[in-house]
């Protein structure tokens, strides 16, 4: 039942994030231990398609890597979602207000600057030496976002399958309880 419940939770999470840019699908992984079944989630490395948005501060990483953003409490979080807006202070922030970090703290983007495929901020003909850190084999596409690679049909099938497994496990547990009660009453009658 634990495994079926975990598969159900993971499939519903994947389905809920089918439209979340940069989301990476979760997969259930389990193991039998002396103390019972252990189930966890593993994040997929499969990337989604790159979609043109035309918005200059939408950024997609092609290849491995992530964006680092800092929230108001100072926590740094890694994300693949590259939907950013330029703030009045010249930083880039996501919809939650988290600030995009460059290689030297918050990334400052001058008004008419662009961001190139290596993540460098270019103002006019000058490289401002501010950059979004990227692995060597990755590039950045400004005006694009990475879509979620989740297949909604496959996740719905997974939800139905996990629900059926859960229901079957519940019936088995109910049958075992009934047998225990019957055996206990049979033993009591014999005495």
At which residue positions do the language-model features occur?
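Amphipathic alpha-helical polymerization modules
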Residues: 1-191
């Amino acid at each position: 039942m634990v495994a079926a419940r975990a598969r159900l939770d993971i499939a519903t999470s994947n389905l809920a994030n089918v439209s979340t840019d940069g989301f990476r699908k979760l997969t259930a992984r389990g193991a039998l231990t002396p103390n019972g079944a252990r189930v966890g989630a593993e994040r997929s490395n499969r990337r989604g398609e790159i979609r043109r948005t035309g918005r200059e501060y939408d950024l997609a990483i092609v290849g491995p890597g992530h964006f680092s953003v800092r929230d108001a409490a100072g926590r740094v979080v890694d994300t693949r979602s590259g939907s950013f807006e330029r703030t009045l202070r010249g930083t880039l922030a996501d919809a939650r207000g988290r600030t995009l970090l460059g290689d030297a703290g918050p990334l400052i983007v001058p008004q008419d600057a662009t961001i190139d495929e290596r993540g460098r901020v270019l103002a006019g003909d000058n490289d401002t030496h501010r950059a979004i850190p990227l692995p060597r084999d990755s590039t950045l596409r400004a005006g694009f976002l990475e879509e979620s690679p989740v297949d909604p049909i496959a996740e719905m099938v997974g939800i139905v399958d996990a629900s059926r497994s859960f229901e079957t496990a519940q019936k088995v547990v109910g049958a075992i309880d009934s047998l225990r009660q019957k055996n206990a009453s049979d033993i009591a009658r014999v005495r």
